[in-house]
């Protein structure tokens, strides 16, 4: 069976993105819909645009790095921000492609928890 990984990425039921140095280099349609932004708007942007504040972006980045170093993956529930400014609870899980440099490159999944955690 041939697997079309690009199609699977694009049609996944959760938001997916690939990152380099905490910037979005690829994302699927579900991520765009979740955050209310187009792919063109998100590609090349720092993850900071998805956080409620720059401080929260920095705080979580510092908290994740040692965990990604040790385990290679990270997950939590956190408040994120849509393009229209609305904040919402989101389950985020990701994997560093290089544990020695955890923010260098990664794959991340985002699940909107609004229905469970308004």
Segment roles from a protein language model:
Residues 31-43:
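PAS/PAS-like sensory domain cap-loop motif
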Residues 19, 92-107:
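Short loop/turn elements at sensory-signaling interfaces that couple input to output
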Residues 1-20, 25, 29:
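Sensory modules in modular signal-transduction proteins
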Residues 1-4, 111-118:
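PAS-associated C-terminal cap
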Residues 54-86:
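Terminal output helix/cap of sensory domains in signal transduction proteins
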Residues 41-54:
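PAS-family sensory/regulatory domains
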Residues 25-27, 33, 51:
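PAS-family sensory domains
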Residues 80, 108-109:
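Sensory beta-sandwich core in regulatory modules of signaling proteins
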